[in-house]
Amino acid sequence: MRTIISLLLLSAMVFAEIEAISLEEGLQLFEGERGCVGENQQCANWAGPHCCSGYYCTCRYFPKCICRKDSGK
């Protein structure tokens, strides 16, 4: 009986740790996207603001860098 209770407690602790790690990774991903800009917005890859997922920063004329949609090429 003690063995069963010990295994249940151990399983609960492992599950809680896995959930905490998943939540932490999700928050880090969200924080990384928080300061991003969308299509045709000014960007600066080296210092920010950075383009959101699915966009890339292109600089045709130096200070005028803008985010363009990533076509996957």
UniProtKB/Swiss-Prot annotation:
Its main location: secreted. One of its GO terms (cellular component) is host cell presynaptic membrane. Pfam families: Toxin_7. Residues 21-34 form a propeptide. Disulfide bonds join 36-52, 43-57, 51-67, 59-65. Expressed by the venom gland. It is found in: Secreted. GO terms for molecular function: sodium channel regulator activity; toxin activity. Residues 1-20 form the signal peptide. Keywords: Amidation, Disulfide bond, Ion channel impairing toxin, Knottin, Neurotoxin, Presynaptic neurotoxin, Secreted, Signal, Toxin, Voltage-gated sodium channel impairing toxin. The modification Serine amide is found at residue 71. The presence of a 'disulfide through disulfide knot' structurally defines this protein as a knottin. Insecticidal neurotoxin that induces an irreversible spastic paralysis when injected into insects. Modifies presynaptic voltage-gated sodium channels (Nav), causing them to open at the normal resting potential of the nerve. This leads to spontaneous release of neurotransmitter and repetitive action potentials in motor neurons. Belongs to the neurotoxin 07 (Beta/delta-agtx) family. 03 (aga-4) subfamily. Aga sub-subfamily. This is U3-agatoxin-Ao1i. It comes from Agelena orientalis.
